[in-house]
């Protein structure tokens, strides 16, 4: 399998398995390589665990980071643990034991202890004679999902056909799949599910179910009829008034999924038959221009001063203009009324985004896609581009505020954007060209400059771009040149090292370009910048620094004035080099620790950002977007929260299919989401509002049995919740939380 997996960041660099005894920086458990994994996930698993999924374990504890305490903490007159920092303030009557007791905190399931998985515990030397307790490791070793599928595999030639009218099998007599439909139904599959009133939710919504006879609800859309010759035939039932064109494929037939690239286009990409004229021209010019810039930069200062006017003119003539200028971009808008759902690896799947849009998210992003696998036509990477039809509707905006962006047309705007990662300019530029060509419903293409994954960082992508500002500028400038009308944006962190923020310089370069290119080429054309208020080194061991985000927001607001100072006043800058022409306004979005409408409004009003991007807060309570819209804390009941689980399940079956494999996929991603959602503490049992994202729940009982179940940190209870809608799990299905901490790092959410 290892031979088939190349480095998705830079194919010229081989994947490096950890040496024996080498300590890994991140605490990730060994995981099997799954067919549906994206390229970066597959490569990371090879690097961490080797090619066979065996764990690398030298018997020593995993590397852990020191927990950084909040500043200005004032202890009470009594024991400072009476009000435990980092523990949600649950009312006493709901605590299983007092909040300061050992069992309410230390004996809580290790899945609740963020520090065990993400930071090195400080310990409490007042206990056990000053000796620190030994903490559980922050990894689940040998994490596996198992496998699931039908006992007998039904041939696709009959899976969607009537019993007596199968399609021609392309394998003929050599086919190893079952062609006897009645035998398959009797012996080759598990019994129909009885959830959802025994009715297929996919068929109920779309009038067809392309899982056909493999559907776990097939009894609700099939029947047995008597033919003229007296034979009884099994047939599938469709509602032609509601179904799409089944010949187009699964998503197109359902009509709810967009941005589906054709198989032919993916094959052409894999065979390098897809023409990329713009990218080729631009990268050729970029290489030539870079050589001349480097030559001039290497001249000593005295050499430059001694140059005659004729030599200076000759040097200017060496510079060649770009082969073409960017197309004028579609206007975009970010405002207080447009909360943004962050790009989330694994969790940011289509069903979850669909649920968040339904609850009020105005802007969404795909999971981070790697440029090289996209250019190679890999199915798993292009699958990340799929969006639900609700994501391609215009965001809700305030017409009074949208006037800030002249010529903004809300009817042409949409919610869904994509995020990519690249380590070299040509990768980002070519990926931007193919995305703008093959993905028709795309709001923006966002360049990830904050991903802290070691594999990505080591190859020069993600947060490594923060330390390579010239390369970052070339990427943004080139992507802007080839992306047609699709705007280019960037997501950055404060910097790579704690205490050494570099966002000021990064933002200035994204806004105006470097000094070596500013005068000749103008602005790079970055339409929006999102700043995550942490460094790469910090990860999630400290609260996001919103004071620094506010300083950066002030810098962005001064953009128009600085633009006037830095551009040639004699010649009006070309509108096509500006991000939101003709205004040239860069939108600025803040990201980090938003968990309530109060946090959101505070960041808008006091930090001065245009909008706020929400990540973990939305995973724990997706109705955060509804709270932002209504301006109040919503105390969702257990039954309401269970309805969201049901919706996710319905959306998952529609996205991944209602056959055995699709049910297993839906269950897996539901459990991944519940590993976050169980951390929610109902507002009605908290002593203080608003809640804090950094607070972990103590051991408590809910207001009813269902609320207690939803709060369980035992993944077997999450399995019970999944069985309410998906029935008993397949005997081969396995699941363990990705970390013992349910708030494991969303690594690609840079």
UniProtKB/Swiss-Prot annotation:
A zinc finger (C3H1-type) spans 155-179, 200-221. Keywords: Cytoplasm, Flavoprotein, FMN, Metal-binding, mRNA processing, NAD, NADP, Nucleus, Oxidoreductase, Repeat, tRNA processing, Zinc, Zinc-finger. Transmembrane segments: none annotated. Gene3D superfamilies: Aldolase class I. One of its GO terms (biological process) is mRNA processing. Residues 17-28, 62-73, 118-130 have a biased composition (Basic and acidic residues). One of its GO terms (cellular component) is nuclear periphery. GO terms for molecular function: flavin adenine dinucleotide binding; mRNA dihydrouridine synthase activity; RNA binding; tRNA-dihydrouridine47 synthase activity; zinc ion binding. It catalyses: 5,6-dihydrouridine(47) in tRNA + NAD(+) = uridine(47) in tRNA + NADH + H(+); 5,6-dihydrouridine(47) in tRNA + NADP(+) = uridine(47) in tRNA + NADPH + H(+); a 5,6-dihydrouridine in mRNA + NAD(+) = a uridine in mRNA + NADH + H(+); a 5,6-dihydrouridine in mRNA + NADP(+) = a uridine in mRNA + NADPH + H(+). The active site is at residue 451. Belongs to the Dus family. Dus3 subfamily. This is tRNA-dihydrouridine(47) synthase [NAD(P)(+)]. It comes from Botryotinia fuckeliana (strain B05.10) (Noble rot fungus).
